[in-house]
């Protein structure tokens, strides 16, 4: 079950970014954070969202070398959207179609490396949110998730 409390997603992202910045990535990547100012707090389980964001950044780092990983937070009426974008290897169409279903990986050691996109999907949908991705082989991946500003 989720433990929902008023949460500032911008502060949460700064906290996660600080953790990653203090441990240089093996891929020599630059981490960039872009946060839209003055967004309201939302009702969320911060621990679970940190788990999702950490997993998405770890995935991006694992598939990106000497590139850029961008984390952005934007708001639109009723929703806040976080995007973790990388300049890495990207995914094939088949991998992209199955990525949120919980049984596909570009990396045979995948399950040793975090919770997986399927669990991210479960956490976001439990918040009344939605998660989706865009990816092209050789051009990187963008994973988005949107959370409602009011409980659904």
Where are these regions (language model features)?
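A conserved beta-strand-to-alpha-helix junction within the catalytic ATP-binding
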Residues: 3-18
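Conserved catalytic submotifs in the C-terminal HATPase_c
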Residues: 3-7, 30-40
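Short helix-loop "hinge" at the ATP-lid/N-box region of the Bergerat-fold HATPase_c
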Residues: 60-61
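Short beta-strand/loop element within the Bergerat-fold HATPase_c
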Residues: 68-78
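Short conserved segment of the HATPase_c
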Residues: 91-103
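Short alpha-helical Gxxx[C/S/T] motif in the catalytic ATP-binding
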Residues: 116, 120
């Amino acid at each position: 079950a989720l433990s929902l409390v008023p949460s500032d997603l911008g502060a949460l992202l700064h906290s996660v970014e600080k953790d990653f910045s203090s441990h240089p990535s093996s891929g020599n990547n630059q981490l960039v954070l872009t946060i839209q100012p003055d967004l309201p707090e939302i009702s969320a389980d911060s621990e679970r969202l940190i788990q999702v964001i950490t997993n998405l950044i770890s995935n991006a780092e694992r598939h990106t070398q000497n590139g850029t990983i961008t984390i952005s937070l934007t708001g639109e009426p009723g929703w806040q959207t976080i995007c973790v974008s990388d300049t890495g290897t990207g995914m094939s169409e088949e991998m992209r179609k199955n990525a949120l279903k919980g049984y596909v990986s570009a990396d045979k050691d995948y399950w040793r490396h975090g919770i997986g996109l399927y669990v991210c999907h479960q956490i976001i949908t439990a918040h009344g949110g939605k998660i989706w991705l865009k990816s092209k082989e050789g051009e990187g991946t963008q994973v988005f998730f949107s959370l409602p500003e009011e409980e659904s």
